[in-house]
Amino acid sequence: MPKQLTWDDAEDIGILLSETHPQLDPLAVRFTDLHRYVTELPGFAGDPKASNEGKLEAIQMAWHEEFQDRTQA
């Protein structure tokens, strides 16, 4: 059974978002959209109301690192 993700799994979520939305620049995504993308991920089991700006920033930065790796490769 795959690991269930929560808001604290920024690295894993960043990888999944990079795979799910490879065409998007994470730094151009609004936090409202990022929140929706995260809660729609398969395996995400976190409480949608438990997110905050710090958790979304951490996810955005993890996604951005994956995005940079893909675009620079």
Give residue ranges: language-model regions.
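A charge-rich, low-complexity, intrinsically flexible signal that marks solvent-exposed coils, linkers
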Residues: P2-A73
